[in-house]
């Protein structure tokens, strides 16, 4: 066997350890449908894996990059198919739990999306929102610009309601 000193051996083990990570293609993807006259991006939050950023500061970089890529594709589809620059985001929270809530991730994502896709969001439609979404929304609300806030909708039994700080109670 190779002659490796104990500290070195420990280092090798750490390097080989893979952090559990979000299955990107299941978490965020283009929804191809003629039903809506818009490019649609789906985000299934149950596939989001929360990580400890202290241990792994760049841990979400791949997630952000993937989401930007998918949304860029959505803009391209909107332009070529619908002569538009807007997309709709479906945020489906079915099967999501408290353990997955990461406000830092949400805040960072908002900043990235607002700077990269300033005028491209038509609506963000939240489906199957658990009660804890309301807590998270209150926390991230101050970071969402006033125009974008108006684009958040709850979907309940096929009806859309705008999310306001009044109906978030």
Each language-model region and where it sits:
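SEC14/CRAL-TRIO lipid-binding/transfer domains and related phosphoinositide-recognition modules
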Residues: 1-119, 123-127, 131-169
């Amino acid at each position: 066997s190779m002659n490796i000193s104990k500290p070195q051996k420990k280092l090798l083990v750490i390097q080989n350890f893979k952090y559990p990570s979000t299955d990107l293609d299941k978490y965020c993807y283009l929804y191809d449908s003629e039903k809506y006259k818009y490019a649609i991006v789906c985000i299934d939050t149950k596939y989001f894996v929360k990580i400890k950023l202290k241990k792994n500061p760049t841990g979400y970089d791949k997630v952000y990059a993937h989401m930007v890529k998918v949304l860029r594709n959505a803009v391209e589809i909107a332009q070529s198919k619908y002569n538009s620059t807007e997309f709709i985001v479906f945020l489906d929270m079915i099967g999501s739990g408290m353990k997955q809530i990461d406000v830092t991730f949400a805040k960072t994502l908002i900043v990235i999306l607002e700077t990269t896709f300033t005028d491209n969001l038509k609506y963000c439609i939240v489906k199957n929102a658990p009660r804890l979404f309301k807590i998270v929304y209150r926390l991230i609300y101050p970071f969402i610009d006033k125009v974008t806030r108006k684009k958040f909708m709850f979907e309940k039994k096929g009806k859309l309601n705008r999310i306001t700080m009044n109906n978030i109670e």
